[in-house]
């Protein structure tokens, strides 16, 4: 997976994703094997993202490294790998948890997210991300600090 930084972390749509990918210079991206100028479009797959307007299916681009043969999905920084819940909603859930607020507020703002999604996000946060963020002195807010 290769994360593409976007300033607008709340905007997720197929047209926005396509415009970001279209504007990318693939030869400037680096593979995890440390080679650059070696990635080419390999294919696409469908991925569901749960937004407040409803769940949408994105067509996500995959690239392949000509040096090591690895394939990578190109994800926007507003998307969390292996999750249907956008980064901004996950951040809000964790912040509400840390501030002892009602965790269902995010569910009300984004009806696509249910209580099981919230429990799963909090389990991952408590077991893994909370200590990593603290040890690296990365604050939970503002959102830009999480993705830089």
Residue ranges and their predicted role:
Residues 1-79:
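Short, conserved DNA-binding cores of transcription-related domains
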Residues 69-148:
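Short, positively charged, Gly/Tyr-enriched micro-motifs
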């Amino acid at each position: 997976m290769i994360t593409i930084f976007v300033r607008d972390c709340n905007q997720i749509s197929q047209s926005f994703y396509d415009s970001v990918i279209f504007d990318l210079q693939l030869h400037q991206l680096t593979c995890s094997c440390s080679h650059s100028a070696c990635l080419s479009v390999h294919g696409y797959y469908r991925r569901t993202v749960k937004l407040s307007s409803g769940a949408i299916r994105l067509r996500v681009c995959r690239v392949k490294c000509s040096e090591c043969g690895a394939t990578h999905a190109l994800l926007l920084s507003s998307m969390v790998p292996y999750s249907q819940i956008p980064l901004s909603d996950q951040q809000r859930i964790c912040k509400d948890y840390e501030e002892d607020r009602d965790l269902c507020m995010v569910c009300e703002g984004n009806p696509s997210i249910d209580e099981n999604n919230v429990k799963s996000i909090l389990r991952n946060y408590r077991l893994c991300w909370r200590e990593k963020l603290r040890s690296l002195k990365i604050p939970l807010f503002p959102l830009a600090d999480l993705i830089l």
